[in-house]
Amino acid sequence: MLERMLPFLGRKRDKAAADLPVRVGHSAPRNSRMLEYDQNLVWVTLLLLAYGLVMVYSATISFHDSPRYAQWSPYHYFIRDLFSIAAALLASWIVVQIPMAELQKWSMRFFFLSLIGLVLVLLPHIGKDVNGSKRWVVFPGGLNFQPSELVKLTALIYAADFMVRKQEVKQSLLKTFLPMMAVMMIVGVLLLAEPDMGAFLVIASITLAILFLGGANGKLFSVFSVAVIGAFVLMIVLSPWRRDRIFAYLNPWSESNALGSAYQLSHALIAMGRGEWFGVGLGGSIEKLHYLPEAHTDFLLAIIGEELGLVGVGVVIFAFYWIVRRAFDIGRQALVLDRMYSALVAQGIGVWIGGQAFINIGVNLGLLPTKGLTLPLMSYGGSALLLNCMAIAVLLRVDFENRILMRGGHV
């Protein structure tokens, strides 16, 4: 059966597939070497996590020179990032044990429970205000959590379940598009109240992608997409500081913009320019010396470009390209096996990781206006690392179940 399906899957049978559980007679499946998960996907993910950890350390090593961070050691962010990665890997190990059927059954409840977090951040003494935005819930012990990162994952699994349930009426405006638009409006209102337009942009993109991949009516999908894009344009037009960002992006080198709205962009471009092909060397960045704000989060790629050059940036871009392509391959395999929910989830994860990486890379290279989105799996930030790794774990689970089914087993 596996050999007959290989032409449709567009990939060669790999060694890991050969080591999957094999059914002997009527006995239960046995494992030959326990290579049950996509080893390449695991290693590429670990590579990005390790790469990000090293660059976060490099970007923050001089922070303690500033009076604002004088009470912290040079290893403060490195230790916190290492702890976040360890917690994310532990959570991923738990998530990868959950069957996709169970995840689908609980997807709606997970989604609506996650919306409670978006409400909590708006409440006094619960939500933490940073630079005029309330995006974090504060827990005892100084731990912060960003609910919008959780909503990215729960919205994805909910949208996939929604499209599976609506397959018979997926062409209907009243039964498919309007309910999804209503849900998106609720999420949008809560996120824009923080405000967090970047997270809303990612969630809207994920939802639209799943509607499209799920076979929604083409004309209605186009109208829905135009409405969403129009809403974002309207928000920019009605917001003076968002308009300033657009104008600054168009002309970042004017004196007023370079010292104002385009300050981060201009310094990110300077960092990229200094790096040239091979960079100035690990640890040799000048822009991280309190010139480039958020060098360890939104603009980590600029520091990579400065210290490791175009080659270092190219490694990051290729790794994300590989993950996105692998996610779509896994989704296509699931679809061939008549597992539509798993297919939509896998490809939705590809859209999420790839889309957010594309926006972050575009901002760092000056190809897109400045937007507060981190680089998945690499930038400093415990909530984002946790949910990115959990998303990869779900992707591994989909692939694992695909392999079991292709070998004649049951999940």
Swiss-Prot record:
Provide the membrane-side ranges marked Cytoplasmic in the record: 1-40, 103-109, 158-172, 218-219, 320-347, 396-411
Which Pfam family is one of those matched by this entry?
FTSW_RODA_SPOVE
Q: What is its EC number?
A: 2.4.99.28
What topology does it adopt in the membrane?
Multi-pass membrane protein
EC top class named in words: transferase
The UniProt keywords, alphabetically, are: Cell cycle, Cell division, Cell inner membrane, Cell membrane, Cell shape, Cell wall biogenesis/degradation, Glycosyltransferase, Membrane, Peptidoglycan synthesis, Transferase, Transmembrane, Transmembrane helix
Reactions catalysed, semicolon-separated, are: [GlcNAc-(1->4)-Mur2Ac(oyl-L-Ala-gamma-D-Glu-L-Lys-D-Ala-D-Ala)](n)-di-trans,octa-cis-undecaprenyl diphosphate + beta-D-GlcNAc-(1->4)-Mur2Ac(oyl-L-Ala-gamma-D-Glu-L-Lys-D-Ala-D-Ala)-di-trans,octa-cis-undecaprenyl diphosphate = [GlcNAc-(1->4)-Mur2Ac(oyl-L-Ala-gamma-D-Glu-L-Lys-D-Ala-D-Ala)](n+1)-di-trans,octa-cis-undecaprenyl diphosphate + di-trans,octa-cis-undecaprenyl diphosphate + H(+)
The entry's family comment says: Belongs to the SEDS family. FtsW subfamily.
Gene symbol of the encoding locus: ftsW
Report the PANTHER family cross-referenced here. Answer: CELL CYCLE PROTEIN (PTHR30474), PEPTIDOGLYCAN GLYCOSYLTRANSFERASE FTSW-RELATED (PTHR30474:SF2)
User: Pathway membership of this protein?
Assistant: Cell wall biogenesis; peptidoglycan biosynthesis
The record lists the membrane-crossing segments as: 41-61, 82-102, 110-130, 137-157, 173-193, 197-217, 220-240, 299-319, 348-368, 375-395
GO:BP terms for this protein?
cell wall organization; FtsZ-dependent cytokinesis; peptidoglycan biosynthetic process; regulation of cell shape
Alphabetical list of PROSITE patterns matching this protein:
FTSW_RODA_SPOVE
Places the protein is found: Cell inner membrane
Q: Which residues lie on this side of the membrane: Periplasmic?
A: 62-81, 131-136, 194-196, 241-298, 369-374
Q: What does this protein do?
A: Peptidoglycan polymerase that is essential for cell division.
The organism is Thiomonas intermedia (strain K12)
Q: Name one GO cellular component term.
A: plasma membrane
What Gene Ontology molecular-function terms does this entry list?
lipid-linked peptidoglycan transporter activity; peptidoglycan glycosyltransferase activity
Which InterPro entries does the record cross-reference, listed alphabetically?
Cell_cycle_FtsW-rel_CS, FtsW, FtsW/RodA
| Name of protein | Probable peptidoglycan glycosyltransferase FtsW
